[in-house]
């Protein structure tokens, strides 16, 4: 089970500084969509150049021109790139093929997908490396959790790994861990904590305890 830190609301320098503080406790560090919008793919390059020992995810949320956009993210140092599950099958397949051509991975974000089970089966067949159930900021504000979506997707796929994101914190991660996802994505639960290093360590300890059980 892998742990990912999602960084959304910092500049690239502060993102790299935070990543270096917590890198011993996480496997993947994400340059979130807001950073990409504000600073572009050089933010991915900056993280890749300045933080050792973690994989770098570029959260581009690709919708079209998928092979080109994946190739650009890879050029700037991304190990994993994201595309939206509501994109066309042709776009998903092009993104998968481009990522795999470079030995990289594709994560499909299921935000706004209505029929989770059907789409997850399709994406599994298309070769997605990760399928991520994602309760976005706006639905988190309404009190929604990704747990039920996680169960639905896990029940129907056989090849892709399952990732989960959305409001996960050190005091709620245990419920997520119990569902055995392959990747848990924590954003503000670490990044906005009073002590991000301690928050990351708490998350890692819970993940590791479950993995060893």
From Swiss-Prot:
Pathway: One-carbon metabolism; formaldehyde assimilation via RuMP pathway; D-fructose 6-phosphate from D-ribulose 5-phosphate and formaldehyde: step 1/2. One of its GO terms (molecular function) is orotidine-5'-phosphate decarboxylase activity. It catalyses: D-ribulose 5-phosphate + formaldehyde = D-arabino-hex-3-ulose 6-phosphate. It comes from the Bacteria. Keywords: Carbohydrate metabolism, Lyase, One-carbon metabolism. Its EC number is 4.1.2.43. PANTHER family: 3-KETO-L-GULONATE-6-PHOSPHATE DECARBOXYLASE SGBH-RELATED. Catalyzes the condensation of ribulose 5-phosphate with formaldehyde to form 3-hexulose 6-phosphate. Belongs to the HPS/KGPDC family. HPS subfamily. This is 3-hexulose-6-phosphate synthase 2. It comes from Staphylococcus saprophyticus subsp. saprophyticus (strain ATCC 15305 / DSM 20229 / NCIMB 8711 / NCTC 7292 / S-41).
